C-alpha cells in the first residue's frame, strides 16, 4: 500500500488537530459538574458515559494525520486507566495542554530535545512532591470519599469502602449486573471457585440444592479417578476417621463415581466430587493454592505420589465446604499461615513479572482467594443503558479506591497538582530551552483545574490564580462553588491517579514535540466506474 509522509510543522500540526478533537470530546466530562457523552453502538442501545478512556476508545478520525494524533492520546488515557483505574480525563487534558505549550515553543525556535528534557525533569520533581505530600488512608470514611468522587455517588463510595474493609486490600471486588433495582453487596468467606458437584446425588440440602460438609478431609488430585480400586484404600481410612470427604480432581467417572453416589444415598459415607477449576498449568497452580490453603498435598505422579498408596496425612482440612451446582466454597482451610504467606508473595512476584492483562487478572484472583476474599457488588438500574453506565462507574471507583490505599490521597479538584508544582519549582534550577520545557509543564498543570471550573460555569483563569495563593490542600469545591479545605471536605484524589496522569501525559507530549515526520497509509480511491459497470439485475437480466 502507498504511503503519505508529512514533515516538520505540517506533521506536528496534523497530530495536534487529532489530539484536540479527541481531548475536546473527553474534557467536557471533568469534575462534579462535568457532562456525559453518548456513544453510538453498531448493535444494541447507545452507551452514556463520563469515563475518559471509554470515550477515547470510540473516536476514529478520517484524516490520516489526525487519526495518528488521536491514537497517541488514546494511549495516554489507556495507560493511566491500566495503572490507576481512573484519571483518564485528567491525563488527556494535561496531554493537550502540554502539547499546545510545547508546540508553541518549537515554532518559536526552541530545541525539541532540550524541551523534552525540561518536561521530564519538571515532571519527575512534581511526581516526587505529590508522593511527599500524600496522606495515608487511615479510615473507612476516606476510602468511601475517594470512591464516591470517582463514581459521583456517595452510596457507591460507602459500599466499596465496606467491601474493601471486609476483603482487605488484596481481596477482589467484582461488579455484576443485577435484575433488581439498586445496589447489593455479597461477601464470600474463604476460597471460592467456579466448579460445582459432578452429580446432583451429592446434595445434602435438597431445598437449596447444595452439599454442605462440616470439618471434611479434602483430596486434591491432578488426574481422573475412574477405577474404584485406586480410591478404596483411602475411602476406608476416611470412613474410620468418621469424616466427610471432598474430592477435587480432573474428573471422577465410571465405577468410582457410582461407588461414591451409592454410599452417599445409603447414608454410609458422605462425600462430594468436584472437577478442578481451570486448564493445564493454571489448573496445577490452583490445585497447589488449595493444597497450601488446606494444609494438604496435590497427589500427582509428577511428584511421585499415587492415589492407591495415599493416606490421611496427604489430605487437606477445612472447617466447612459448601458446594452448589456451579461453585465450591472452602471456608477456613487448615493450612500453615507461614506457607500461605510464602505462596502469596510468589503470586505477587508473578503479577509484577507478567506483561499480559489477562494473566495479571487471573493471578490477582488467585491472590485474593488466598490472602483476602471476594466481594461482589450487584448493581441494578431502570434501563439497560443506565445499568451499563452505572456498572462502569462502580468498576472505576473500585480501582480508584485501591489506588488510594496504595499511595495515599491528595486534595482533589486539580488543586494538588497545581500546588505541588509551585513547591517543586522552588528547587528546580534549569537553564535555556530546558527551563522553557519545564515552564510548559508549570503552565499545563493548571489545565485540569481550569477545565473543572469551566464545566462548573466559572472563569478558569481566575480560579487558578486564586488557588495558587491558598494554603496547600485548600481549593475550589466545584460542586458548591466555595473555596475550602478539600481534604476535610472529603474531596480527595489518589496520589497514584494524579501522578500517573501527569507522567503519562508528559511522556506523550515529549514524543509529539520530537516528531519530525509522520508516515501514514494513503487512502485508497474507489475504482472508477466499478459501480457503474455492475449488472443492475445481478446477472439475471434475461429473466422476466
Curated annotation (Swiss-Prot):
<keyword id="KW-0413">Isomerase</keyword>
<keyword id="KW-0143">Chaperone</keyword>
<dbReference type="InterPro" id="IPR002423">
    <property type="entry name" value="Cpn60/GroEL/TCP-1"/>
</dbReference>
<feature type="binding site">
    <location>
        <begin position="29"/>
        <end position="32"/>
    </location>
    <ligand>
        <name>ATP</name>
    </ligand>
</feature>
<dbReference type="Pfam" id="PF00118">
    <property type="entry name" value="Cpn60_TCP1"/>
</dbReference>
<dbReference type="InterPro" id="IPR001844">
    <property type="entry name" value="Cpn60/GroEL"/>
</dbReference>
<keyword id="KW-0963">Cytoplasm</keyword>
<keyword id="KW-0067">ATP-binding</keyword>
<dbReference type="GO" id="GO:0016853">
    <property type="term" value="F:isomerase activity"/>
</dbReference>
<dbReference type="InterPro" id="IPR027413">
    <property type="entry name" value="GROEL-like_equatorial_sf"/>
</dbReference>
<protein>
    <recommendedName>
        <fullName>Chaperonin GroEL 1</fullName>
        <ecNumber>5.6.1.7</ecNumber>
    </recommendedName>
</protein>
<comment type="similarity">
    <text>Belongs to the chaperonin (HSP60) family.</text>
</comment>
<dbReference type="InterPro" id="IPR018370">
    <property type="entry name" value="Chaperonin_Cpn60_CS"/>
</dbReference>
<keyword id="KW-0547">Nucleotide-binding</keyword>
<dbReference type="InterPro" id="IPR027409">
    <property type="entry name" value="GroEL-like_apical_dom_sf"/>
</dbReference>
<dbReference type="GO" id="GO:0042026">
    <property type="term" value="P:protein refolding"/>
</dbReference>
<feature type="binding site">
    <location>
        <begin position="86"/>
        <end position="90"/>
    </location>
    <ligand>
        <name>ATP</name>
    </ligand>
</feature>
<dbReference type="GO" id="GO:0051082">
    <property type="term" value="F:unfolded protein binding"/>
</dbReference>
<feature type="binding site">
    <location>
        <position position="493"/>
    </location>
    <ligand>
        <name>ATP</name>
    </ligand>
</feature>
<feature type="binding site">
    <location>
        <begin position="477"/>
        <end position="479"/>
    </location>
    <ligand>
        <name>ATP</name>
    </ligand>
</feature>
<dbReference type="GO" id="GO:0005737">
    <property type="term" value="C:cytoplasm"/>
</dbReference>
<dbReference type="GO" id="GO:0140662">
    <property type="term" value="F:ATP-dependent protein folding chaperone"/>
</dbReference>
<dbReference type="GO" id="GO:0005524">
    <property type="term" value="F:ATP binding"/>
</dbReference>
<comment type="subunit">
    <text>Forms a cylinder of 14 subunits composed of two heptameric rings stacked back-to-back. Interacts with the co-chaperonin GroES.</text>
</comment>
<feature type="binding site">
    <location>
        <position position="413"/>
    </location>
    <ligand>
        <name>ATP</name>
    </ligand>
</feature>
<comment type="function">
    <text>Together with its co-chaperonin GroES, plays an essential role in assisting protein folding. The GroEL-GroES system forms a nano-cage that allows encapsulation of the non-native substrate proteins and provides a physical environment optimized to promote and accelerate protein folding.</text>
</comment>
<dbReference type="InterPro" id="IPR027410">
    <property type="entry name" value="TCP-1-like_intermed_sf"/>
</dbReference>
Amino acid at each position: 500500500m502507498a504511503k503519505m509522509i508529512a514533515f516538520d510543522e505540517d506533521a506536528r500540526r496534523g497530530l495536534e488537530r487529532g489530539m484536540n478533537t479527541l481531548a475536546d470530546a473527553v474534557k467536557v466530562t471533568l469534575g462534579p459538574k462535568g457532562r456525559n457523552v453518548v456513544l453510538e453502538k453498531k448493535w444494541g442501545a447507545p452507551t452514556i458515559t463520563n469515563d475518559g478512556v471509554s470515550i477515547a476508545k470510540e473516536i476514529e478520525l478520517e484524516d490520516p494525520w489526525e487519526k495518528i494524533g488521536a491514537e497517541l492520546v488514546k494511549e495516554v488515557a489507556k495507560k493511566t486507566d491500566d495503572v490507576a483505574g481512573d484519571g483518564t480525563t485528567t491525563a488527556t487534558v494535561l496531554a493537550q495542554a502540554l502539547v499546545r505549550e510545547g508546540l508553541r515553543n518549537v515554532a518559536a525556535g526552541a530545541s525539541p530535545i532540550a524541551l523534552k528534557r525540561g518536561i521530564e525533569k519538571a515532571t519527575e520533581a512534581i511526581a516526587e512532591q505529590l508522593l511527599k505530600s500524600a496522606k495515608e488512608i487511615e479510615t473507612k470514611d476516606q476510602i468511601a470519599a475517594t470512591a464516591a468522587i470517582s463514581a459521583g455517588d456517595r452510596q457507591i463510595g460507602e459500599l466499596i469502602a465496606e467491601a474493601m474493609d471486609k476483603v482487605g486490600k488484596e481481596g477482589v471486588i467484582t461488579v455484576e449486573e443485577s435484575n433488581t433495582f439498586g445496589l447489593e453487596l455479597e461477601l464470600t468467606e474463604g476460597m471460592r471457585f467456579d466448579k460445582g458437584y459432578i452429580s446432583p446425588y451429592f446434595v445434602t440440602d435438597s431445598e437449596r440444592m447444595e452439599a454442605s460438609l462440616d470439618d471434611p478431609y479434602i483430596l486434591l488430585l491432578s488426574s481422573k479417578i475412574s477405577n474404584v480400586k485406586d480410591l478404596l484404600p483411602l475411602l476406608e481410612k476416611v470412613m474410620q476417621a468418621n469424616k466427610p470427604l471432598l474430592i477435587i480432581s480432573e474428573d471422577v467417572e465410571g465405577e468410582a463415581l457410582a461407588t461414591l453416589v451409592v454410599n452417599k444415598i445409603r447414608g454410609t459415607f458422605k462425600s462430594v466430587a468436584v472437577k478442578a477449576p481451570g486448564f493445564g498449568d493454571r489448573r496445577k497452580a490452583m490445585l497447589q493454592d488449595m493444597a497450601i490453603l488446606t494444609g494438604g498435598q496435590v497427589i500427582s505422579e509428577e511428584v511421585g505420589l499415587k492415589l492407591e498408596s495415599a493416606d490421611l496425612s496427604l489430605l487437606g482440612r477445612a472447617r466447612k465446604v459448601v458446594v452448589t451446582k456451579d461453585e465450591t466454597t472452602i471456608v477456613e482451610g487448615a493450612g500453615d499461615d507461614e506457607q500461605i504467606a510464602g505462596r502469596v508473595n510468589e503470586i505477587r512476584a508473578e503479577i509484577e513479572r507478567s506483561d499480559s492483562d489477562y494473566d495479571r487478572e487471573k493471578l490477582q484472583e488467585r491472590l485474593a482467594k488466598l490472602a483476602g476474599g471476594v466481594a461482589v457488588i450487584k448493581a441494578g438500574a431502570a434501563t439497560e443503558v443506565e445499568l451499563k453506565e452505572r456498572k462502569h462507574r462502580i468498576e472505576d471507583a473500585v480501582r480508584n479506591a485501591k489506588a488510594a490505599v496504595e499511595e495515599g490521597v491528595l486534595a482533589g479538584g486539580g488543586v494538588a497538582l497545581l500546588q505541588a508544582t509551585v513547591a517543586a519549582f522552588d528547587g528546580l534550577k534549569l537553564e535555556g530551552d530546558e527551563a522553557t520545557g519545564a515552564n510548559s509543564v508549570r503552565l499545563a498543570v493548571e489545565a485540569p483545574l481550569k477545565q473543572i471550573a469551566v464545566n462548573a460555569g466559572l472563569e478558569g483563569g481566575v480560579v487558578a490564580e486564586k488557588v495558587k495563593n491558598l494554603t496547600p490542600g485548600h481549593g475550589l469545591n466545584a460542586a458548591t462553588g466555595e473555596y475550602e479545605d478539600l481534604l476535610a471536605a472529603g474531596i480527595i484524589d489518589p496520589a497514584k491517579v494524579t501522578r500517573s496522569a501527569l507522567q503519562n501525559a508528559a511522556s506523550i507530549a515529549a514524543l509529539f514535540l520530537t516528531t519530525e515526520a509522520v508516515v501514514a497509509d494513503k487512502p485508497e480511491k474507489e475504482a472508477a466506474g466499478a459501480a457503474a459497470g455492475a449488472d443492475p439485475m445481478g446477472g439475471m437480466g434475461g429473466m422476466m
